[in-house]
Amino acid sequence: MLAAAGRLIHSKGDEFTTQELCAEAGVALQTFYRYFASKDELLLAVIGDAMNDACEYWTESAAELPDALARLRYFITSTLARLDGDGRDAATARFIVSTRWRLHRNYAKELAEAEKPFVDLLRAEVNAAVDAGLLNPPDPEWDPWFIAELARSVFHYYAFAEHAEGELEVVKEKLWRFCLTALGGSLEP
């Protein structure tokens, strides 16, 4: 059902019915309600699944980077990569933002749990960078959450804002410099 929901999201955003989802998934409506109490619960599961997939992808992609600081930079700036893609990526980004805000009103704790893998990914690299003497954050337990929220805020803005070619690369650099400074890291001269 999650794969079927993903296909419908790419074609319709969240403007699909549970009946359309069941038809796409090839399951009965009763089967849907056996797993999910509502469409919103399905969307939370889709977000959680997408977050897990993204974190796995980023972890694999960053495996060859030289140190925790390079991996942390990659993880933070990669959150904006989809914004510089084709029309389908832009539509997906807008869906993520609008759906996330709508779900946040009624499912704040569940949404935080679905997004926790990204915070955990950042926390692991912050701690590894601290152990390597590369960072000195004021609060290594909480700071990754604040960084995730900042990256999300930038993503939300640029999902809807027009931007010039190359602008996102500048934004990624500025986001990284801000986060590095906030974590007690030093900027290279």
Predicted region positions:
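Amphipathic alpha-helical interface segments
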Residues: 4-8, 24, 31, 78, ...
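Short secondary-structure transition hinges
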Residues: 81-123, 131-135
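Hydrophobic/aromatic-rich alpha-helical bundle segments in the mid-to-C-terminal region
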Residues: 90-94, 108, 112, 131-176, ...
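Helix-turn-helix
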Residues: 4, 8-41, 45, 49
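Hydrophobic alpha-helical connector segments
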Residues: 45, 59-88, 144-147
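Short, basic, alpha-helical segments at the C-terminal edge of helix-turn-helix-like DNA-binding modules
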Residues: 48-56
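Phosphate/oxyanion-binding loops and surfaces in catalytic or ligand/nucleic-acid-binding neighborhoods
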Residues: 53, 82-86, 150-157, 178-186
